């Protein structure tokens, strides 16, 4: 649990980890988060709502820094979310065994298991949306203030963390709008109005984040769409190929399961009136998901974690299936047979998830080997005058925060494969950087070393500390 971020997409994992550590070390105000990467000057930057990074930072201040603390926070939120999802299944099925099996199925898609406690905000956003799902259902059964407030709390935190987690709320509300009683539209709208709060808060936060980043000339967390219709044919083919070859097999253990959903759904439409409560949210969720995928199409080539919040469709799809079985077969034997038939799928999900997690944790071997060394050089850096207050230029590291977070030093890296040009080095000097830390093949030629470095201060294994020219 105390491992540093590793494996697939450790760049993005280190962003959140860096923010939490900076909250702790610099005692930052909640609305002024900061990263190890200095960017233009200060390193002040923000993307998703940083509440949990802030709380983790406060925990560090009390208990001391440990990556294990971060993971336990993530695990606690995941456990709460999936416990409430189990409660939602129980509300719908009145069966403990069915609820447990369905809950395990939702919890064990291989991609979700791998990223579960691995620092990414997407997994906890999904879990929080499941909490919102439960309290929304409770509110529908009994419109109490407690259910409303708790539902709004969970959905607000989910959508503030990842906007795509809000698709589930829109899908749920859509049923009320489609099925309102004649002459009672206004009453329905008034009852649903509070559920717009998560989106209002998120809009306010997005505006603040844009303003905050602009103050420090930072565009790292800029959320831009890359729609399908703006790409060339070659780019579209590249996304499809990359997705199918890399991510598709890890959506669920049985990739063919997704292919069965369309005819399965079409079959259920024969009983639309009886299944309206399950059908409408499912259709709306699927429709919005298609729009989301088209808007961010290019991102799906390399960023599989964009899929995580879209797993909000799984509970809706599973309850749709249960409802079809109940309509077709009135006795409990059919449900029992369904449970028995589902066991191999759930078991395969669990098994595949374990293999995926182990495989992915050992990918990006270059980073894993390099960064484990960087996490062990704190005393060496202090001995050579590079304390936590002294910024450093870290090469070769094309990520914003990986090497800097592992060393726990602020500064610059050659982000996005930034060439070590005179202009870039001068920028480093302008923001107070006097040391160049070289690891692996950071300086590829003696010419670069002659131009940008003087005086090898010290070396430790394959890590070398220079003064900047």
Positions of PLM-derived features:
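Transmembrane alpha-helical segments
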Residues: 1, 165, 321-323, 337-369, ...
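Extracytosolic helix-loop segments that constitute the early lumenal/periplasmic catalytic or substrate-binding loops
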Residues: 2, 12-43, 51
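Transmembrane-lumen/periplasm boundary regions of multi-pass, lipid-linked membrane glycan transferases
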Residues: 15-26, 157, 168-278, 287-291, ...
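Transmembrane-helix motifs of polytopic, lipid-linked glycan transferases
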Residues: 69-93, 131-135
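Membrane-interface transmembrane helices that cradle and orient dolichyl/undecaprenyl
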Residues: 90-93, 97, 132-148, 158, ...
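Membrane-interface alpha helices of multi-pass inner-membrane proteins
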Residues: 103, 147-163, 169-173, 290
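Short acidic/glycine- and proline-prone juxtamembrane loop motifs at membrane-interface regions
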Residues: 114-125
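Short periplasmic/luminal acceptor-recognition loop of GT-C membrane glycosyltransferases, typified by
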Residues: 371, 375, 379-418, 434-441
């Amino acid at each position: 649990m105390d491992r540093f971020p590793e494996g697939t997409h450790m760049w993005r994992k280190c962003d959140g980890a860096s923010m939490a550590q900076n909250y702790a070390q610099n005692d930052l105000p909640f609305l002024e988060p900061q990263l190890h990467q200095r960017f233009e000057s200060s390193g002040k930057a923000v993307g998703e709502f940083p509440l949990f990074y802030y709380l983790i930072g406060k925990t560090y201040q009390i208990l001391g820094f440990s990556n294990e603390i971060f993971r336990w926070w993530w695990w606690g939120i995941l456990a709460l979310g999936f416990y409430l999802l189990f409660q939602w299944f129980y509300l719908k099925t009145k069966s403990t065994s069915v609820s447990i099996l369905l809950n395990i199925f939702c919890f064990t898609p291989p991609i979700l298991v791998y990223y579960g406690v691995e620092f990414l905000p997407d997994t906890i956003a999904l879990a929080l949306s499941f909490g919102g799902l439960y309290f929304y259902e409770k509110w529908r059964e009994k419109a109490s203030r407690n259910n409303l407030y708790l539902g709004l709390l969970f959905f607000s935190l989910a959508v503030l963390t990842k906007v795509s987690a809000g698709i589930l709320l829109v899908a749920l509300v859509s049923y009320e709008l489609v099925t309102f009683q004649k002459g009672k539209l206004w009453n329905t709208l008034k009852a649903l109005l509070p559920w717009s709060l998560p989106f209002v808060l998120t809009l306010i936060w997005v505006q603040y984040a844009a303003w905050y980043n602009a103050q420090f000339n930072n565009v790292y967390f800029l959320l831009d769409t890359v729609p399908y219709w703006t790409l060339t044919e070659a780019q579209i083919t590249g996304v499809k190929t990359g997705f199918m070859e890399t991510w598709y097999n890890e959506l669920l253990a049985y990739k063919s399961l997704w292919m069965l959903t369309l005819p399965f759904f079409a079959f259920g439409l024969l009983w639309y009136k009886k299944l309206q409560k399950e059908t409408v949210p499912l259709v709306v969720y699927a429709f919005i998901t298609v729009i989301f995928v088209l808007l961010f199409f290019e991102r799906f080539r390399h960023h599989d974690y964009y899929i995580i919040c879209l797993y909000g469709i799984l509970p809706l799809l599973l309850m749709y299936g249960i409802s079809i079985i109940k309509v077709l077969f009135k006795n409990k034997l059919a449900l029992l047979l369904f449970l028995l038939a589902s066991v191999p799928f759930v078991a395969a999900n669990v098994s595949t998830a374990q293999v995926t997690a182990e495989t992915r944790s050992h990918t990006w071997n270059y980073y894993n080997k390099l960064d484990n060394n960087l996490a062990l050089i704190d005393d060496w850096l202090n001995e050579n005058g590079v304390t936590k207050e002294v910024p450093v230029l870290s090469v070769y590291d094309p990520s914003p925060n990986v090497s800097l977070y592992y060393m726990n030093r602020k500064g610059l890296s050659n982000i996005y494969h930034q060439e070590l040009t005179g202009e870039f080095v001068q920028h480093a000097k302008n923001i107070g950087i006097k040391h160049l830390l070289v690891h692996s093949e950071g300086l590829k030629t003696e010419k670069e070393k002659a131009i940008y470095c003087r005086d090898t201060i010290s070396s430790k294994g394959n890590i070398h500390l220079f003064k900047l020219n």
